[in-house]
Amino acid sequence: IDSINNIDTLIDEKGAKSEQDIVGRVYEYFLGKFAATEGKGGGEFYTPKCVVNLLAEMIEPYHGKIYDPCCGSGGMFVQSVQFVESHKGNKKDISIYGQEQTTTTYKLAKMNLAIRGIAANFGDVPADTFFKDQHPDLKADFIMANPPFNLKAWRGPDELTNDPRWAGYEVPPTGNANYAWILHMVSKLSESGVAGFVLANGAMSTNTKGEGEIRKKLIENDLVDCMIALPGQLFYTTQIPVCLWFLTKNKKAETIPGHSDSNHRNRQG
């Protein structure tokens, strides 16, 4: 009860909060508390709100299809909807697609959005994104994600070596899934799609087992918009510094969903 009293459910300057918003704040509060208590295990499904806010502000998902291939408890989607509504938009203008492998976390995500009245497609079952893609034909306008940092043994030595998601690039190494996540997200972007995601800082400079070649090719293909280094100690899972990556599928397009030309130029400058 004392914990609930600490949650911001007061009326703000814009008027009374809806019951859905209040319940959503309570749910979000306890997700954060649980993640802090569980440490590494809890952090697998929870991304700090300040990081999610920054991603949303950078990619500006006003309308279109939003995708998270490792959606955890669904925080990226909640913040996307809040971003749209705070800019006088309509949450019905966005369509949400997510995937989560862990059964419990999959249920947490569905509940997180359901209590807020947010429609979402999480696929039929919890599943591994690399081996059982729940949205095989999806082309997303926006991707927001916080993949597991430096995931090891994500595939066997002879598995997924000819996967079409790696076409034109080196095959991501078995010992670290960071670049597999990147290439998966690139494959999911629409022709003018934008992606913003979190990775360990090492992803910006690694040259291990073809990762440097993949990064070089991403730059040569003019996909990398910018990278932002963040301070350490932001996550419950790790104390190492992290970075944000932003990819744009077609920088030469006259318009990108949710972006004005001036905003897009400013981001690249």
Regions found by a protein language model. Name each.
Residues 16-24, 41-49, 175:
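Conserved phosphate/pyrophosphate-binding and hydrolysis machinery centered on Walker-type P-loop NTPases
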Residues 139-140, 176-178, 192-200, 224-225, ...:
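Active-site lining segments that contact anionic ligands and/or coordinate catalytic metals
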Residues 235-269:
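Flexible, glycine-/basic-rich loop-and-beta segments that form/coincide
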Residues 62-63, 189-195:
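Short glycine-dipeptide loop
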Residues 1-35:
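Long recognition/docking surfaces used for binding and targeting
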Residues 41-145, 150-160, 165-168, 180, 223-232, ...:
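Conserved S-adenosyl-L-methionine
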Residues 164-189:
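Glycine-rich S-adenosyl-L-methionine
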